[in-house]
């Protein structure tokens, strides 16, 4: 049996996000990851404003299994998200596969949407399939 599914990648999703927004914060593990995300965002929207943050130490804290609440305090995300709000960032993109570990805790700090690109990609794929079946 053959399925007609589109081929999609996280990098394509960054391009979609670039079109949908004017100002994003991107949290990545390191500068290489951030550069890849930024390049794809800017391909889609050269006028996009991006506030990039690299946090390899966050990856290490997550890998130790430290509780989410402790991580939020250790990295003072309350202050970071206060800054995001004050500069009118529209959404925060989790540009590392480790970071969804603290997503629920981050969502409690602010009303700024937190985008897990993996979930965003699945939602886009589901939407595409529903459109084809209509």
Positions of PLM-derived features:
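Non-catalytic structural scaffold of enzyme domains
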Residues: 1-134
């Amino acid at each position: 049996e053959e399925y007609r599914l589109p081929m999609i990648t996280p990098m394509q999703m960054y391009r979609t996000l670039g079109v949908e927004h004017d100002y994003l914060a991107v949290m990545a593990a390191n500068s290489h990851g951030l550069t890849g995300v930024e390049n794809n965002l800017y391909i889609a929207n050269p006028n996009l404003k991006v506030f990039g943050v690299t946090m390899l130490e966050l990856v290490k804290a997550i890998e130790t299994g430290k509780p989410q609440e402790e991580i939020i305090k250790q990295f003072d995300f309350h202050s970071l998200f206060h800054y995001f709000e004050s500069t009118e960032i529209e959404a925060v993109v989790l540009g590392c596969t480790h970071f969804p570990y603290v997503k629920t805790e981050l969502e409690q700090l602010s009303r700024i949407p937190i985008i897990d690109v993996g979930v965003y990609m699945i939602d886009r794929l589901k939407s595409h399939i529903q459109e084809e079946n209509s």
